[in-house]
């Protein structure tokens, strides 16, 4: 049995879904680079640090490596990937999870009535995911193996929170499709997949439920554990038929049924298809069109 660890990279892993995804990959024995900006617990109202996440990864059986990285900074991102390649020589799994999420997303009113900073999700969310994928793809194409995962959600197809939020989720799905198409046409064993997460039981959601248990308490029963999508990413990476998913947008709850993955106690989170009748968009697989 090989003692070489799978090298994974999870962006936005100080807390929330990113922290859980990194923890899950640690349970599968991966070397997990966790990035984010939070070094000290008091630096963010919701707590969590990249160091704490890395410690959890190692305690779970993997190797956690915390790297402070501002994904809005091209220099930070470039330096980070250079470090990973110098230390590991490969990148096997990339999970694009970093996004600029603010509490004001849930405020009432039109987008013009809320802070302009909500548009930061276009930079740390859309652009940051493209940049990270660009660097990771260099390694994956060269080694002819790899998986790029985008964390997305039903906001790609129906209104949730704000136009910037919806644009971010829709972009995750379309980038996965288009990148997957280019990997296919290049004949490479690299897959790009977008996963619709459900209501993830993050620190933020716990605060929402605690603020009004009568109104929001039902969210817990249908929620996903933060580790849930991490287990899905591992199942995809190790699936011999991974190529069949390349370019796809998958509802995480449905993917879990296929792989036999559940939350604690065997609980299966509901699918958006069943609960809301919402499904991912079917993109056209026309041959790539390029000038020249």
Report each predicted region and the residues it spans:
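The beta1-alpha1 cofactor-binding region of Rossmann-like NAD(H)/NADP(H)-dependent oxidoreductases
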Residues: 48, 68-80
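Rossmann-fold cofactor-recognition segment
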Residues: 57-73
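Active-site loop of short-chain dehydrogenase/reductase
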Residues: 5-6, 62-63, 90-91, 140-154, ...
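Catalytic loop of short-chain dehydrogenase/reductase
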Residues: 100-103, 112-117, 147-186, 196-200, ...
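C-terminal helical subdomain
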Residues: 190, 194, 213-292
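Canonical Rossmann dinucleotide-binding motif of NAD(H)/NADP(H)-dependent dehydrogenases/reductases
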Residues: 2-39
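A short, exposed helix-loop element centered on a Lys and neighboring polar residues
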Residues: 133-134, 177
């Amino acid at each position: 049995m090989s003692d070489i660890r799978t090298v994974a990279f999870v962006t936005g892993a100080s807390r929330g879904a990113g922290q859980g995804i990194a923890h899950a990959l640690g349970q599968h024995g991966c070397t997990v680079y966790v990035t984010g900006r939070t070094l000290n617990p008091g630096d963010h109202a919701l707590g969590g640090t990249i160091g704490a996440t890395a410690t959890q990864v190692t305690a779970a059986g993997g190797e956690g490596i915390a790297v402070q990285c501002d994904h809005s900074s091209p220099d930070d991102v470039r330096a980070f990937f250079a470090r990973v390649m110098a230390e590991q020589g490969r990148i096997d799994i990339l999970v694009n999870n970093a996004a600029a999420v603010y509490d004001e997303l849930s405020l009432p009113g039109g987008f013009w009535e809320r802070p302009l900073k909500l548009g930061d999700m276009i930079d740390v969310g859309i652009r940051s995911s493209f940049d990270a994928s660009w660097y990771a793809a260099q390694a994956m194409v060269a080694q002819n193996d790899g998986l790029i995962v985008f964390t997305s959600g039903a906001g790609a197809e129906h209104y949730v929170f704000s136009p910037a939020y919806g644009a971010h989720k829709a972009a995750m799905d379309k980038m996965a499709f288009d990148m997957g198409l280019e990997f296919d046409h290049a004949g490479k064993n690299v897959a790009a997949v977008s996963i619709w997460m459900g209501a993830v039981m993050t620190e933020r959601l716990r605060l929402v439920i605690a603020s009004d248990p009568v109104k929001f308490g039902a969210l817990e029963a249908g929620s996903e554990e933060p580790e849930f999508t991490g287990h899905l990413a591992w199942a995809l990476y190790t699936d011999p038929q991974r190529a069949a998913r390349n370019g796809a947008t998958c509802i995480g709850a449905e993917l879990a049924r296929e792989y036999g993955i559940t939350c604690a106690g065997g609980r299966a989170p509901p699918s958006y298809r069943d609960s809301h009748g919402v499904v991912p968009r079917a993109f056209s697989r026309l041959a790539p069109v390029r000038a020249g």
